[in-house]
UniProtKB/Swiss-Prot annotation:
Belongs to the acetate uptake transporter (AceTr) (TC 2.A.96) family. Pathway: Mycotoxin biosynthesis; patulin biosynthesis. It is found in: Endoplasmic reticulum membrane. It comes from the Eukaryota. Disruption phenotype: Strongly reduces the production of patulin. The chain crosses the membrane at residues 42-62, 71-91, 106-126, 141-161, 169-189, 202-222. Patulin was originally used as an antibiotic and specifically trialed to be used against the common cold, but it is no longer used for that purpose since it has been shown to induce immunological, neurological and gastrointestinal effects. Genotoxic effects of patulin with dose-dependent increase in DNA strand breaks in brain, liver and kidneys have been detected in mice. However, more recently, it has been proposed that patulin might also have anti-tumor properties. One of its GO terms (cellular component) is endoplasmic reticulum membrane. This is Acetate transporter protein patA. The gene is patA. GO terms for molecular function: acetate transmembrane transporter activity. Induction: Expression is correlated with the production of patulin. Expression is positively regulated by the secondary metabolism regulator laeA. Expression is strongly decreased with increased sucrose concentrations. This decrease is lost in the presence of malic acid. Expression is increased with pH changes from 2.5 to 3.5 in the presence of a limiting concentration of sucrose, 50 mM. Natural phenols present in apple fruits such as chlorogenic acid or the flavonoid epicatechin modulate patulin biosynthesis.
């Protein structure tokens, strides 16, 4: 009985050891299989976002400059709501999933602006009708709206400076667009029609330049993926890296 018990214990120990070894081998195999499994990557939405921004900004800017007498911005409400409104908000969420906080903030900000600006200009929302007896108050209200958004875009511009010159130029000229357009509405509110018109056209000119920067970025991103070359963006990160090192020392 004693030998039998010892044999049983020894057999159990051997089985346990074998089970432990098999379990360890299984874990090792699973770990190796996981290591060799390709990670699933999410595609970049940046080109789509830049394209939507470029389309909305260049068309609106041409209207502000009154090219071919296209002075009525209501014609671009579709752009405001769908192309640059919903489109940029969706792109922003995509950037957030990829971990790009800057892209999420910029695309999301411009998307929300376009949705709000579209609502102001869309007759269905009744904004203009609410101020039909006091157009100066409407111009002042829109001026404040644009001025506050210009401040927001100014922070975008500062954040883009350590990245590259193209992003800085695009956001900087768009910030000037908001500021000049706000000044234009304030001038119209004060019955300075000629000054208001000049400021509006100047805002359109800066907005058009901002749109060109966006188109350039679209070309850079698309050629980078399809043709294996890209356009220079004017990388400023080395300059800011040197400035940070000097500041530390």
């Amino acid at each position: 009985m004693k030998l039998s018990a010892e044999g049983t214990v020894m057999a159990s120990s051997e089985e346990a050891a074998q089970l432990s070894c098999d379990t360890s081998s299984s874990h090792a195999r699973n770990s190796k299989e996981q290591d060799f499994q390709p990670t699933q990557q999410i595609g970049s939405p940046t080109a789509l976002g830049m394209g939507a921004f470029a389309i909305a900004f260049t068309t609106l800017s041409m209207s502000l400059m009154e090219w071919r007498s296209a002075a009525i911005t209501n014609a671009y409400i579709g752009n405001c709501f769908f192309t640059a409104g919903m489109g940029l908000v969706l792109v922003a969420q995509w950037e957030l999933v990829r971990g790009n906080s800057f892209g999420h903030t910029v695309f999301g900000g411009f998307g929300l602006f376009n949705l709000a600006f579209g609502a102001i200009n869309a007759p269905a929302f009744g904004v203009a009708d609410a101020f039909k007896d006091d157009p100066a108050a409407l111009n002042n209200a829109i001026g404040y709206f644009l001025l506050v958004w210009g401040i927001f875009v100014l922070f975008f511009t500062v954040a883009a400076m350590p990245m590259n010159l193209v992003y800085t130029g695009m956001l900087g000229t768009s910030q000037i667009t908001y500021t000049l357009l706000a000044a234009s509405y304030f001038s119209f509110a004060d019955d300075h029609a000629s000054a208001g018109l000049a400021l509006k056209k100047a805002a359109g000119a800066f907005g058009f330049v901002s749109g060109l920067f966006a188109w350039y970025t679209v070309g850079h991103l698309m050629c980078q993926d399809a043709l294996l070359f890209s356009f220079p963006l004017g990388d400023t990160s080395p300059l800011y890296a040197r400035l940070q090192r000097k500041k530390r020392h």
